[in-house]
Amino acid sequence: DCLGWFKSCDPKNDKCCKNYSCSRRDRWCKYDL
């Protein structure tokens, strides 16, 4: 199970879906460009 767009996340334990990454500043999953 992974976190999708705009889901809140922990940068130290990034569980965002493939092609997403946890933003340290905003603390939600953002699309990786």
UniProtKB/Swiss-Prot annotation:
Disulfide bonds join 2-17, 9-22, 16-29. One of its GO terms (molecular function) is sodium channel regulator activity. Expressed by the venom gland. It is found in: Secreted. Keywords: Amidation, Calcium channel impairing toxin, Disulfide bond, Ion channel impairing toxin, Knottin, Neurotoxin, Secreted, Toxin, Voltage-gated calcium channel impairing toxin, Voltage-gated sodium channel impairing toxin. The keyword Secreted applies. InterPro entries: Huwentoxin-1 (IPR011696), Huwentoxin_CS1 (IPR013140). One of its GO terms (cellular component) is extracellular region. Belongs to the neurotoxin 10 (Hwtx-1) family. 04 (CcoTx1) subfamily. Negative results: has no effect on some calcium channels (Cav1.3/CACNA1D and Cav3.1/CACNA1G) and some sodium channels (Nav1.3/SCN3A, Nav1.4/SCN4A, Nav1.5/SCN5A, and Nav1.6/SCN8A) (IC(50)>30 uM for all channels) (tested in fluorimetric assays). Potent inhibitor of hNav1.7/SCN9A (IC(50)=16 nM, tested in patch-clamp), and modest inhibitor of Cav2.2/CACNA1B (IC(50)~3 uM on rat and human channel). It also seems to be potent on hNav1.1/SCN1A (IC(50)=2.18 uM), hNav1.2/SCN2A (IC(50)=0.13 uM), hNav1.7/SCN9A (IC(50)=3.34 uM) and hNav1.8/SCN10A (IC(50)=6.92 uM) (tested in fluorimetric assays, which shows results with lower activity than results obtained by patch-clamp). This toxin inhibits Cav2.2/CACNA1B by acting near the pore region, but without overlapping the omega-conotoxin binding site. This is Beta-theraphotoxin-Cd1a.
